[in-house]
């Protein structure tokens, strides 16, 4: 009798696997970090073979720690860092180049060329995305143009492309299945999210052969089988990490919004079955493909959130441990007029300025370590407010609450300041591993382990609610200062 679902959670800095039981308890967790590769300024890569090795290793480890037999596993669900691009030889199964990570800016010149040709409007209207180096399409083109022999192999049908989910399914099934789901496809900048097919106009412009691309399916269905300790286990859930978190937060209704505070910060609002094109710098993406229906979401991606705390710790050496952030932030009553704009790799939504760079402004002789640490924390919340304000304007839906998850949502100071600055209650669930939980739910629903979405909604439990306490005058004053600081950071690297 199957009693468990295993979630594979392949992130930007680590590979994880979590075994969940029917009652959503985390029976075991295994995690392993892998190498971050920075060949040049603004370039970020991963070794796809190392991603596979670490991910399969922690999958086996989590099962072993839980003491679970393969026949007790109902299904495997996959959630993954999105946009990160792998191209491999379908005959050898070997990547022809390192995976180009979502954070990598090397393809900014390709994006500039697309804009010069006037393709940005077409791409926005059909993929829901803005033309940016963040997405997969230009990364595929770069690999084909710059790896010797790649273009010839691609034209012969010998190369395959995949986001990380596709790469993992290919490896788990022994090269039998080349597939992705709607949520991951919607992040490539080459997938038409209105017509639900790879977009031939964009493929032609980027010179990407259709033969490289995976089949696109629902986020909850049986894609293939993984061989786990001699038994075949269905792989039956796939969603990009942020869509998976929205699903794990039971964000099934129009207007439901969540913010995941990780390396970056990612806000998604469910907008239902109708496509809305943002007029305020957001992207439209596929929230989920479930039971043959597509739901859309508005998304704002903040490139640097938790990563700003790592920078304060590792580069400025103002912290010994990231866990100390809240302690220092609450030692002072405010930032003493300091703002930190962490535009280390440009600014994401709603600005989309590839050439913005980080800045620290408002420094006087009286500014100390705690002020700068607090400014770093507040920057995470300000960037989220930028996105949420744009969402409300686009959707016409007033936010009733914001559900939160991800590592930094455990920081009570940050959650209270987030509530204060958006003037909306912030809800933190008992289970904050919602990204992995979403993948588990999708996998479990496909095989009947859980019954339906209503059952999942009933399982969502609140741990703590944060309510706004700032006056309108104070809130506006703080936010005006932030907007001024953002202007200082823009267009810096031109």
From Swiss-Prot:
Which species? Brachyspira hyodysenteriae (strain ATCC 49526 / WA1)
- This protein's pathway: Polyol metabolism; glycerol degradation via glycerol kinase pathway; sn-glycerol 3-phosphate from glycerol: step 1/1
Q: Name one Pfam family in it.
A: FGGY_C
Q: Which family does it belong to?
A: Belongs to the FGGY kinase family.
Q: Which reaction does it catalyse?
A: glycerol + ATP = sn-glycerol 3-phosphate + ADP + H(+)
Which residues are involved in binding ADP? Answer: 12, 16, 263, 306, 407
Source taxon at top rank: Bacteria
Under SUPFAM superfamilies, the record lists:
Actin-like ATPase domain
NCBIfam families hit by this protein: glycerol_kin, PRK00047.1
Q: What is this protein called?
A: Glycerol kinase
- Protein's UniProt keywords contain DNA damage: no
Record keywords: ATP-binding, Glycerol metabolism, Kinase, Nucleotide-binding, Transferase
Task: List ligand-binding residues for sn-glycerol 3-phosphate.
Answer: 12, 82-83, 134, 241
């Amino acid at each position: 009798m199957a009693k468990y679902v295993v979630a594979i959670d392949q992130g930007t800095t680590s590979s994880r696997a979590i075994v969940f039981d029917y009652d959503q308890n985390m029976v075991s967790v295994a995690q392993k970090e892998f190498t971050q590769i920075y060949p040049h300024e603004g370039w970020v890569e991963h070794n796809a073979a190392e991603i596979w090795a670490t991910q399969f290793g922690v999958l086996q480890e989590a099962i072993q720690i839980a003491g679970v037999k393969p026949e007790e596993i109902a299904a495997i669900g996959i959630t993954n860092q999105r946009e990160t691009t792998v191209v491999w030889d379908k005959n050898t199964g070997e990547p022809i180049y390192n995976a180009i990570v979502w954070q990598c800016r090397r393809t900014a010149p390709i994006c500039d060329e697309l804009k010069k040709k006037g393709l940005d409007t077409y791409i926005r209207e059909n993929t829901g995305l803005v033309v940016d180096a963040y997405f997969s399409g230009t990364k595929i083109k770069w690999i084909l143009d710059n790896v010797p022999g790649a273009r010839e192999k691609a034209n012969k049908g010998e190369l395959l492309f995949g986001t990380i989910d596709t790469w993992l399914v290919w490896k788990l099934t022994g090269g039998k299945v080349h597939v992705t789901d709607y949520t991951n496809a919607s992040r490539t900048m080459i997938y038409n999210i209105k017509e639900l097919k790879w977009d031939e106009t964009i493929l032609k412009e980027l010179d990407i052969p259709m033969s490289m691309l995976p089949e696109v399916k629902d986020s909850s269905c049986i894609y293939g089988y993984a061989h786990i300790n001699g038994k075949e286990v269905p792989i039956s859930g796939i969603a990009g990490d942020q869509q998976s978190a929205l699903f794990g937060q039971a964000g099934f209704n129009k207007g439901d919004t969540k913010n995941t505070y990780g390396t970056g910060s990612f806000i998604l609002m469910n907008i239902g079955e109708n496509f809305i094109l943002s007029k305020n710098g957001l992207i439209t993406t596929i929230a989920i493909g479930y039971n043959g229906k597509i739901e859309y979401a508005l998304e704002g991606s903040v490139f640097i959130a938790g990563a700003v705390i790592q920078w304060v710790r590792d580069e400025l050496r103002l912290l010994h441990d990231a866990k100390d952030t809240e302690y220092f932030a609450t030692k002072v009553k405010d930032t003493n007029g300091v703002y930190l704009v962490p535009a280390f790799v440009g600014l994401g939504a709603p600005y989309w300025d590839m050439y913005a760079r980080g800045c620290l402004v408002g420094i006087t002789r009286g500014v100390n370590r705690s002020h700068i640490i607090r400014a770093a924390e507040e920057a995470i919340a300000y960037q989220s407010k930028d996105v949420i304000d744009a969402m409300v304007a686009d959707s016409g839906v007033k936010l009733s609450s914001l559900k939160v998850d991800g590592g930094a949502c455990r920081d009570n100071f940050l959650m209270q300041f987030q509530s204060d600055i958006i003037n909306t209650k912030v809800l933190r669930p008992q289970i904050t591993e919602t990204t992995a939980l979403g993948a588990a739910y999708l996998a479990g629903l496909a095989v009947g382990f859980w019954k339906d979405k209503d059952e999942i909604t009933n399982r969502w439990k609140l741990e703590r609610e944060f309510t706004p306490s700032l006056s309108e005058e104070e809130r506006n004053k703080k936010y005006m200062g932030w907007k001024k600081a953002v202007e200082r950071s823009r267009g810096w690297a031109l």
